[in-house]
């Protein structure tokens, strides 16, 4: 048995491990044109369109994402390659495929969890929530500058290093080319995060939609996961403004979640909102998170 295979089996049997993989999972080999990997046979996550597995290679855990070819095309691979060196974006290490699936081999961020589970049992303090949202805005700006829109910004698609409080954006299956001028009539993201103009009129513009989803993420960071707020709650007139946060924080959320898209906070003005006064406009690179993948896959 090879050392990477032994390491993966040891990880799977550790009841305290954060990998959330079933300890009874078997280990199989998977080969690409460049490398041999070892992968658990039971997923960490099962979704409607993809499954995510833990794998191992060259002494480091990695993620395997299987995306059904029947459900969606391989756009995610194209987008991740284009965003390869973009700060705050999950890194695609390698890609392969079989008859049924696109197989994305993706970096694993240690000590991390998605934001949905991060605030599952707790409401975040304003200082922490503000820094998370500011990071998110900077990352989305980086994606925007490369000519793309993520298309499905939500708690589940943001992972956070629980020690350093640094986030990364994942799951680019709904990402599309940026088009600021034309209305869009197809919604590829999550319905609960849809903007009101699409709900009412069946169209949206990409940047106002992005601002809306950022506002939704901000609202939900101040709530327990079971209390997550969505479009229908706002349209019903329920109060979505968190209590016990600053007036500038309340104003930011209100500005993002304005029903009239023409009065909503503009995408380009997000970063200069008074709520973020004093925060540095920088995103820490992957090597500072504890794993330098440039030296892992050779």
Swiss-Prot record:
InterPro entries: Kinase-like_dom_sf, PIM_Ser/Thr_kinase, Prot_kinase_dom, Ser/Thr_kinase_AS
UniProt xrefs under Pfam families: Pkinase (PF00069)
GO function term, MF aspect, one: ATP binding
Domain Protein kinase: 38-276
Stimuli inducing this protein: Expressed in the late phase of the viral replicative cycle.
Protein family according to the UniProt entry: Belongs to the protein kinase superfamily. Ser/Thr protein kinase family.
Protein name (record): Serine/threonine-protein kinase 1
Role this protein plays: Essential for viral replication. It may mediate the virus' progression through DNA replication.
Signal peptide positions (record): none
Keyword field: ATP-binding, Host cytoplasm, Kinase, Late protein, Nucleotide-binding, Serine/threonine-protein kinase, Transferase, Virion
Active site per the UniProt annotation: 152 (proton acceptor)
SUPFAM superfamilies: Protein kinase-like (PK-like)
Entry EC no(s): 2.7.11.1
Native source species: African swine fever virus (isolate Tick/South Africa/Pretoriuskop Pr4/1996) (ASFV)
Catalyses which reaction(s): L-seryl-[protein] + ATP = O-phospho-L-seryl-[protein] + ADP + H(+); L-threonyl-[protein] + ATP = O-phospho-L-threonyl-[protein] + ADP + H(+)
A single cellular component GO annotation: host cell cytoplasm
Subcellular location field: Virion; Host cytoplasm
Residue positions binding ATP: 45-53, 65
